[in-house]
Amino acid sequence: MAKILVLYYSMYGHIETMAHAVAEGAKKVDGAEVIIKRVPETMPPEIFAKAGGKTQNAPVATPQELADYDAIIFGTPTRFGNMPGQMRTFLDQTGGLWASGALYGKLGSVFSSTGTGGGQEQTITSTWTTLAHHGMVIVPIGYAAQELFDVSQVRGGTPYGATTIAGGDGSRQPSQEELSIARYQGEYVAGLAVKLNG
């Protein structure tokens, strides 16, 4: 049995929705145990509420537990072309795992969201830098998801990982195409994890 963690941060719910689609795809793979968790919110609750943050039910992960999984699929929104402070703070607490090599050889993949599309790929590839320092095997999705070839509508999705475009005011929710790409990413990573660890 390969253990897959879908680990995300989501303020307004876009990445949370994508995380559930990623997990749905991963659960299609026989021999994959899939768990969804989120990183802790660092914003004071009253500020989070004033900013329109969405309450989420996923349990909160600890950095130490990352070592328990064979593959980790990270979901992070984009803040100024990079991951937000909440995800950065969480990953900055993995120094002990780095020192012991606890994540070495584990699969790592990333999906993201942006307001208007700016920085979605950079957010994914800059997250890869942290995964590389841990010796994780980075898993992009390439162009195997056929939805990536559809240019008839505004949509997220890159060969690096699934993405969604939320719109400047956050009102646009992930489209069916974007969710399909996210499901593909989950299924693809889980399939590799089972082959390597199942």
Curated annotation (Swiss-Prot):
Reaction it catalyzes: a quinone + NADH + H(+) = a quinol + NAD(+); a quinone + NADPH + H(+) = a quinol + NADP(+)
Cofactor binding remark: Binds 1 FMN per monomer.
Protein name per Swiss-Prot or TrEMBL: NAD(P)H dehydrogenase (quinone)
Entry's family note: Belongs to the WrbA family.
Root EC class: oxidoreductase
GO cellular component, one term: membrane
Residues at which NAD(+) binds: 12
